[in-house]
Amino acid sequence: MLKKSLLGTRNWRRLCLTAVLSVSMLGIVPQAFAEGPNDPAPSITPTTANGKKVLFDNTHGQTAGAADWVIDGGFSDFANALGNAGYLVKELRKSTAITLSDLSAYDVFVIGEANIPYKTSEQSAMLQYVRGGGSIFFIGDHYNADRNKNRWDASEVFNGFRRGAWTNPAAGMSTAEAASAAMQGVASSDWLSANFGVKFRYNALGDITANNIVSPSQAFNITSGVSTVAMHAGSTLAVTDPNKAKGIVYLPATTTKWASAVDQGVYNGGGVAEGPYVAVSKVSAGKAGFIGDSSPVEDATPKYKREETGGTKTTYAGFQEQNDASLLVNMVNWLATKESYTSLTQVPGLTLDSATTIYSWEQPANTTELQAEPWAAPAAGYNWWDPSTFKVGSYGYSTATNTTDPFAFVHQAQLPNQAVFQVKIILNGLTANSTTTGYNIGIYNGSGIQVAKVQNSNGTWPSTYGYSTSFSLTADASGHAEKIVSIQINPSISGSANMRLRQNTTAKFTEAVTIANVPVEPLP
């Protein structure tokens, strides 16, 4: 994360002009009311397509705290540069776990500072995606860059284990946190190292210009045109399997640590011994790239407010600093290129790295929590796992009435299975002041089995789970209609399901939902 402005007024005006030109050249799909996982995801369509597609993750806390790592916000310079290079770029937004089907249509999956741990099922999906020829770009940060105060930072999320919490990934969490849907299916493992031959170290270095650049001929041409790369509080990586992974950018010798580092910050005096700042990996048919700081990727155009406080975010124009832009676009170009070799030993003329020497206390089971976590107490009423507690203007905040989309549901983040709760049904685009009939609503699981009862208009309840009795909706002068229904879910059901609105027997709108044993929350 950058700590200071990087551009003067003149350069900033030039950057703004460049951004405006980029938007007009590319054709960003505008989104109304695109504020949560159930809204249409933004995308960038290139004027001249190269036939390849890049997907940016926005399902694991990428907008928590000051982060705004989305393609129409704090990562827009990067995303637009990829669009200018011919890539179709899209954001992944959803409220359920990532699956292989989410990734398989894309050449590269970019993960900017995930702050919510990936479930083992998601790790399996990502690994299967890479082994099948896809590529992932992991963008990390310094240790303890815990933006949503859930005790997990991006380095820990990517590695697969929390520092000092190897035996219990929910250590120190409240009962509600540990029981949240976000923490279900999470298990400690040395996942990144075991599968990609590299791991993020839990160091925390300060403001440093990386100028130890591996020559393009030994870096798959990713470093072509790259002499320097910025770091503004970041980490390095450790190569654990040189047959899979290789460093391509290193820091100079340094003792400069991040001012708030919980330990010595700099582990081996910088240089090659500190481990690479930027690295790559070849896994089966696919690839991966890694960088230890989000500062080189971000720009100064955040989209959202802070989910915890509602405050304005400040991000910086790091993509324009040093040779950051060239490195990042080159990285995606390499990641998007399919190559048949499955090990770095098969690359003619390539000099393999030596494994990075790490301390015994860096081994997963030996790590310790050096300071109490989270690093600060969350604001009163803010729960990182519950978007209904997020502040207005943040990603996931959903109390505004949707007056744009044809259909929408408003409900709490997880649907309770032990009590009656309410759902608001919204329709737009109807004929002004008209009444339409024949609507019904139901909730069904992955097997198509109905799992909910909907209260009848006379206050009684049906005897079996299924679609509701028919009801009508009357539009106002603007063609907007709403109806609130009370629902009771089978108490033995939990996990993923679908909520569907029909008109007679025709499906009109379907939304993926999650069912859990959670308290009832009032509608916003």
Where do the protein language model's features map onto the residues?
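Second-shell loop/turn segments in exported
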Residues: 61-69, 110-116, 173-182, 314-321
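Catalytic beta-strand/loop cores that center a nucleophilic Ser/Cys/Thr
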Residues: 190-299, 373, 421, 426-428, ...
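Aromatic-Pro/Gly-enriched surface loop or interdomain linker
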Residues: 33-105, 142, 315-319, 337-406, ...
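Solvent-exposed loop/turn segments at secondary-structure junctions
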Residues: 60-63, 95-98, 110-118, 136, ...
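Beta-strand-enriched, solvent-exposed domains that form extended recognition/catalytic surfaces
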Residues: 410-524
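A glycine-rich, often tryptophan-bearing local segment used as a flexible ligand/cofactor-contacting loop or short
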Residues: 117-221
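Sec-dependent N-terminal signal peptides of Gram-positive bacterial secreted proteins and lipoproteins
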Residues: 2, 10-34
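Structural recognition of the beta-strand scaffold that forms the well-ordered cores
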Residues: 54-56, 90-91, 107-112, 135-140, ...
